[in-house]
Amino acid sequence: MAGTLVVIPTYNERENLAETVARVRAAVPEASVLVVDDSSPDGTGDLADELAAADGAVHVLHRIARNGLGAAYLESFGWALEQGYDPIVQLDADGSHLPEQLPSLLERLGQPDAAGGRVDLVIGSRWIPGGSIENWPRHRELLSRWGSAYARWMLRLDTRDATAGYRAFRADAMRRIRLEDVHTRGYGFQVDMLWHAREAGLSVVEVPVTFVERVRGRSKMSAAIVIEAAVRVTAWGLRSRFGRRSMAQPTNGGSGSSAAGRSRA
């Protein structure tokens, strides 16, 4: 099995899921979709099963508990690589990542980079020229910009939008990342993955996207999540400067965390 896989993690996204999946399938008809649901009490998982039953390109992973965005992505990456998908895309369920812009990410992936190699990871960026946000309050924009800038400074990253979640990976490049060493489950997962991608020597580029605030449902973001991410980034940065990076955290949440595999193969 080959082709593009768009991974959509969900928790209480019943109001948004069907529209997002339909837009992905319209924007990139050849792509498959994997919904990774953390036992949403609002019935998102049941809706995902209905979508999979109606469309053979839609698949579902049901996880037995809410274990964080990072754990959901890590399990889905393992599944995608086992099934032979390439490339692998991250996309939010709430409509904030516009599926209509996915072709621009996929087009850049695999093209020559500035060093004469191939682009391994494309990030849809809000903070490069041409990128933008819609309907965000000023304080949230400032917080996001600060988070990216702080991660860049602490970890010596080149990426302008280090916390962005709209990403496309080449499968071969993802295999070079030590996914078993990516332990972050919450907001800091995107930075953790980016840092590991850099350490693995991946070629990373950004393309401009428009990030749109959700119009239905509640955001999962909170001050506690942001603080946790900042603490982790600080610890990683200090360890990278003054000693070996050590992560005393649980291993990959994909192990034993799924109640069922895919609804459709």
Can you say where each PLM-predicted feature lies in the sequence?
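Hydrophobic helical membrane-anchoring modules
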Residues: 1-3, 156, 180-265
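Short, conserved active-site loop motifs that form the nucleotide-linked donor/cofactor pocket
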Residues: 4, 31, 57-59
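Short, well-formed alpha-helical segments that are part of the catalytic scaffolds
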Residues: 13-27
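Acidic helix N-cap motif at the loop->helix transition within catalytic regions
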Residues: 15-19, 42-51
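Short beta-strand/loop segment that forms part of the nucleotide-sugar
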Residues: 30-40, 62
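A conserved acidic beta->alpha catalytic loop
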Residues: 37-46, 95
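Acceptor/aglycone-binding surface of glycosyltransferases and processive sugar-polymer synthases
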Residues: 61-82, 99-187, 214-229
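Short beta-strand-to-loop acidic/aromatic patch adjacent to the donor-nucleotide binding site
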Residues: 85-96
